[in-house]
C-alpha cells in the first residue's frame, strides 16, 4: 500500500508539471558544444526526460536566463531510469545510475576542461549525486563549483552532506515535513514543494561560478 501511495503521488507530480517536453530533453554535454558552465542533474523517481519535469529544468532554465549562451544542461539518463524500486536499494539508487553520473562528470572534465561544473538532484536523484560525487578523483571534484539537492533521500544517512565533498559547495533543501530527509521513504505533500526553492538554488550556483 505504501509503494502504491508513493507511485500515485509521484505520477501526479509528473502529470501536473508545467515544464514542457522540449525542456526536459537536455542532453547538451553529450551532443553539444562546450560552454562556460555545465549543469548535471539527476531527476526524481518517475520523472520523464533527461532533467525531469520540475526542479531540474527549473534550475537549468534559471541558469540559462542569467548566463545567456554560456550554460549546457545535461540530465543523467537514459541508464538512470528513475524507477521507484531503486529507492529501496542500499545506496538509494542503482549502481547503473551512479556509474552514468560518474561518466558524465568525467565527460565534462575531459571534453570541456575549462568548464565550471554545477550539479543537482531531486529525490532519488539526490542519492545519485551522494554516491557519484565521492567516487570522482580530486581534480574533477575541484571542477564542481556547487551542488543543489532537493528532497534529499540521503540527508540523514550521510549527515547532511555529500561525503568527501566540501559543505560550502553544497546546499540541501529539505522542506518541513518532508520525511525522506529524515531517513525514510515515506512521501508527504512536502516532498513536492521544491519548485519554491529553484530561484534560491540558481542564485547559490551562480554565486560560485
UniProtKB/Swiss-Prot annotation:
The reply to whether Chloroplast figures as a keyword in the UniProt entry is: no
What are the catalytic residues?
123, 178, 191
Instruction: Write down the PROSITE patterns for this protein, in alphabetical order.
Output: CUTINASE_1, CUTINASE_2
Q: What is its EC number?
A: 3.1.1.74
Q: Look at the named UniProt entry and state the broad enzyme category this protein falls under.
A: hydrolase
Signal peptide start-end: 1-16
User: What are the protein's UniProt keywords?
Assistant: Disulfide bond, Hydrolase, Secreted, Serine esterase, Signal
Q: Where in the cell is it found?
A: Secreted
The chain's disulfide connectivity reads 34-112, 60-73, 174-181
User: Site annotation (Transition state stabilizer): which residues?
Assistant: 45, 124
Cellular-component GO terms for this entry: extracellular region
Q: Which GO terms describe its molecular function?
A: cutinase activity
Family statement drawn from the similarity comment of this UniProt entry:
Belongs to the cutinase family.
**Name used for this protein in its record:** Probable cutinase 1
Instruction: State the organism named in the record.
Output: Aspergillus terreus (strain NIH 2624 / FGSC A1156)
